[in-house]
Structure formats: structure tokens, C-alpha cells
Regions:
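Acyl-donor (CoA/ACP) binding surface of acyl/acetyltransferases
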Residues: 1-44, 60, 73-173
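Active-site rim helix/loop that mediates acceptor-substrate recognition in acyltransferases
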Residues: 51-70
Length: 173
């Protein structure tokens, strides 16, 4: 039998007018897996829809980043359900921390991504104490670029992340 892990970590809960940004929990799996199985949602997140098991593993990785780095992605809750994610992540191959966000398709076009990403952005600047965050956005992802612009980000460069060309948007404090 393996020993118990002694690491503990806290994930704060953030509130906006319409949203709660909080830790992912097991009860989010049905909504999260449906979102990750949607080809339109996954189009700009690697392109391949995820199975239920892959969605569970993604939730585990999201929680693992909180344990390893002390920050990560929040579940975005609206109308009593998990509608997506927003937060700050920093994968090993990323050149700097990224403000990232993604919502399930029924929640598109309602300003929810901007609201969630704005709350995560403010929290990220405070938590990390940094002067900038990146958003790596595929060139065809017009909706995500619009969110970045609304939050005051500026497209500064292009790079390749996990084999995909992306525009490098920069958010400054």
C-alpha cells in the first residue's frame, strides 16, 4: 500500500456578479466531460474531443497544478453548474504564465468568458506578483482574441505551443 500524501493546498473561491470561480470537484465531471467532448469547444484546445476518462484526467492535472505551483485553473460556475474554466497556468514548455479560459458552448456570447477571465487575471496578478501574463491564442480563435482585447491585452508576437501556431497576447498590470 502506498503512503498518504502529506501535501495540502488551498484553492480560493472568487465571486463576480454572475459567477463563482472555485476548485474543480468530482461532481463537475458530467458537465465538464460533455464540454470536453464537444468538437467546437475543443477546436482551439488541441482539436481532439476528449473522452469522459480523459476529461477526468484533465481535472486531475488541473488540481495537480494547484498542488505543484500554488495557482491554476478555476472551475467557472454559473447557474449552478460547471460551465468551463479560467485561471493561470504555467506548463513546463510555456515561456511564461498564461491567463487561459474556456467555456462550454451554451455560455458563449454572453460576456461570461470576459467576466471569468477578468476575475482570474486580477487574482493572478496579485497571487503571482508579476507585471504580465500571456494568453496564447490560435489565430482563428476570434472569440478568445476579443476577450483578450476587452481585458486590455495586446498581441505582441507569435510562437508555437504544443505544435500549434499561436498569437502571443500580453496582459499587463
Amino acid at each position: 500500500m502506498l503512503g498518504r500524501m502529506g501535501t495540502t493546498f488551498e484553492i480560493p473561491t472568487l465571486h463576480t456578479d454572475r459567477l463563482t470561480l472555485r476548485a474543480f470537484r468530482a461532481g463537475d465531471l458530467d458537465a465538464f466531460a460533455a464540454m470536453q467532448a464537444n468538437p467546437e469547444v475543443r477546436r482551439f484546445l488541441g482539436g481532439t474531443p476528449l473522452s469522459r476518462a480523459e476529461s477526468w484526467s484533465l481535472m486531475e492535472r488541473i488540481l495537480g497544478q494547484w498542488a505543484m505551483r500554488g495557482y491554476g485553473m478555476f472551475a467557472v460556475e454559473i447557474e449552478g453548474r460547471c460551465a468551463g474554466w479560467a485561471g493561470v497556468l504555467h506548463a513546463l514548455e510555456w515561456p511564461e504564465p498564461e491567463l487561459a479560459y474556456s467555456l462550454d458552448q451554451p455560455f458563449w456570447g454572453r460576456g461570461i468568458a470576459t467576466e471569468a477571465a477578468g476575475a482570474a487575471r486580477a487574482w493572478g496578478f496579485t497571487r503571482l506578483g508579476c507585471a504580465r501574463l500571456a494568453s496564447f491564442i490560435m489565430p482563428d480563435n476570434v472569440r478568445s482574441a476579443r476577450v483578450a482585447e476587452k481585458l486590455g491585452a495586446v498581441r505582441e508576437d507569435q510562437t508555437t505551443i504544443r505544435g500549434f501556431p499561436v498569437d502571443w497576447w500580453v496582459h499587463r498590470t
